[in-house]
C-alpha cells in the first residue's frame, strides 16, 4: 500500500478543494492514486451536493472580466466566507466571468449550458464544486455590458471581490471610467438618472425620509431646537416648471419680508434655489449616479464633473455579494439541541 504523506494530502486538497480528512480517506481508499481519489471524492460528493441544494448560500465573490468590447460581472455564492477564499472557488468565479463574457448568454438558464474549459457545462461545474468543496456553491447572476471602440470600460472590484463594478464611459479614458466605478462601488447607486426611478418608489422613499425627519424633530423639540420642515419632493422628476417657479416666488417673498433690497436678489436667489434643489432631490442623491456628490471631487455632483470634462456615463452594473439574500439565523439553543440529537441518533 502506498504511503499517504502530508504532501500527497496537500496536493489532493489543492486539486479538489476537499477537507483534510476527506482527502486522506480518499487517498487511503484509492491506494494513493490522486486521479482516482479526485473521482472518488466527486462520486461521494454528488450525494452530498443534492442534500445541500436547499441550503442558503449568501457569502461568495463577484467576478469581473473584460473581453474587448464586452465585459461581464458575475456573482457566485458559497455558504461561508472561509470557502469564498478557497483557491478552487476563486478560480471558478474568474472562469465563470470569462465564459459569460465570451458566450454572451441571454439569461441564467442559457448561462448554465455554456461550456467550461474543462468540457463540462457551467451547471455541471457548480454541482462538482459543491461535491468537492463540501458546501453549497451556486451561480447566482450576471450582467453583460458592451461598448464601442471609442468608449472605455471601468472595471473595479472592492473589499476583496465582494463588490464588482463595470461602467461604460463615453468621452473619457479607462482612468476616468475606473474612478467612476470606484464611486459606484462606494456610493451604491442603483440607476443612472432620476428618469429611471419608479414614481411609487420615489413616493415611498420620500415617506421614509419624512418619517426620519419627524423622529429627529421629536428629539430637537426636547432640547428646544427648531424643528425641521417636512419635504414635499424627493426627486427631480417631481420638480415641474410650476414647482420651480413657485419655489422662486417663495424665495422672493421671503427676501422682501426680510427687507433685502431687490437689487441684490439676483445674487441671493441662485444659492437658495440650489439649496431647494438639494433638499428636494434626496431620493435621487441616494439612488441615482448622476445626482450623487462625486467622491473624487466633492464640490461637484457626478453629472457636473462629467460635464466639466465633456464625458458621460452610458451604462453601469454593480453587484454586491449577498444583496437580497435572506441569511438563516438559527437560534443557538435550537442549534445545540439539534446537534445533540444528531449525535444521539434521534
Curated annotation (Swiss-Prot):
Cellular component, GO annotation: cytoplasm
Compartmental location: Cytoplasm
- Where is the segment annotated Involved in Mg(2+) ion dislocation from EF-Tu? 80-83
Presence of keyword rRNA-binding: no
User: Is Ribosomal protein one of the keywords UniProt gives this record?
Assistant: no
A single GO molecular-function term is: translation elongation factor activity
Q: Which one Pfam family would you cite for this protein? A: EF_TS
Q: Which UniProt keywords apply?
A: Cytoplasm, Elongation factor, Protein biosynthesis
Function of the protein: Associates with the EF-Tu.GDP complex and induces the exchange of GDP to GTP. It remains bound to the aminoacyl-tRNA.EF-Tu.GTP complex up to the GTP hydrolysis stage on the ribosome.
Q: Which family does it belong to?
A: Belongs to the EF-Ts family.
For this entry, the protein name equals Elongation factor Ts
Native source species: Streptococcus suis (strain 05ZYH33)
Q: Which gene encodes it?
A: tsf
Amino acid at each position: 500500500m502506498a504511503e499517504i504523506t502530508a504532501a500527497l494530502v496537500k496536493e489532493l486538497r489543492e486539486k479538489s478543494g476537499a477537507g483534510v480528512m476527506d482527502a486522506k480517506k480518499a487517498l487511503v481508499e484509492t491506494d494513493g492514486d490522486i486521479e482516482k481519489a479526485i473521482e472518488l471524492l466527486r462520486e461521494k460528493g454528488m450525494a452530498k451536493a443534492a442534500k445541500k441544494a436547499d441550503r442558503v448560500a449568501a457569502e461568495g465573490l463577484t467576478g469581473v472580466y473584460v473581453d474587448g468590447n464586452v465585459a461581464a460581472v458575475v456573482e457566485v455564492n458559497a455558504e461561508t466566507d472561509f470557502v469564498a477564499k478557497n483557491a478552487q472557488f476563486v478560480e471558478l468565479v474568474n472562469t465563470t466571468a470569462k465564459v459569460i463574457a465570451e458566450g454572451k448568454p441571454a439569461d441564467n438558464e442559457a448561462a448554465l449550458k455554456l461550456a467550461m474549459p474543462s468540457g463540462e457545462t457551467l451547471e455541471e461545474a457548480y454541482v462538482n464544486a459543491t461535491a468537492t468543496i463540501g458546501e453549497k456553491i451556486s451561480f447566482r447572476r450576471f450582467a453583460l455590458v458592451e461598448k464601442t471602440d471609442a468608449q472605455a470600460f471601468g472595471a473595479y472590484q472592492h473589499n476583496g471581490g465582494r463588490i464588482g463594478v463595470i461602467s461604460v464611459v463615453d468621452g473619457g479614458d479607462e482612468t476616468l471610467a475606473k474612478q467612476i466605478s470606484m464611486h459606484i462601488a462606494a456610493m451604491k447607486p442603483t440607476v443612472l438618472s432620476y428618469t429611471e426611478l419608479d414614481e411609487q418608489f420615489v413616493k415611498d422613499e420620500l415617506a421614509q425620509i419624512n418619517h426620519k425627519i419627524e423622529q429627529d424633530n421629536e428629539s430637537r423639540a426636547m432640547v428646544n431646537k427648531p424643528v425641521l420642515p417636512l419635504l414635499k419632493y424627493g426627486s427631480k422628476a417631481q420638480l415641474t416648471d410650476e414647482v420651480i417657479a413657485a419655489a422662486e416666488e417663495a424665495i422672493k417673498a421671503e427676501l422682501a419680508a426680510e427687507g433685502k433690497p431687490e437689487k441684490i436678489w439676483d445674487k441671493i436667489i441662485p444659492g437658495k434655489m440650489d439649496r431647494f434643489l438639494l433638499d428636494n432631490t434626496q431620493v435621487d442623491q441616494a439612488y441615482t449616479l448622476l445626482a450623487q456628490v462625486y467622491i473624487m471631487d466633492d464640490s461637484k455632483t457626478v453629472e457636473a464633473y462629467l460635464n466639466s470634462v465633456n464625458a458621460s456615463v452610458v451604462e453601469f452594473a454593480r453587484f454586491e455579494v449577498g444583496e437580497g439574500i435572506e441569511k438563516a439565523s438559527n437560534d443557538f439553543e435550537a442549534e445545540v439541541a439539534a446537534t445533540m440529537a444528531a449525535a444521539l441518533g434521534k
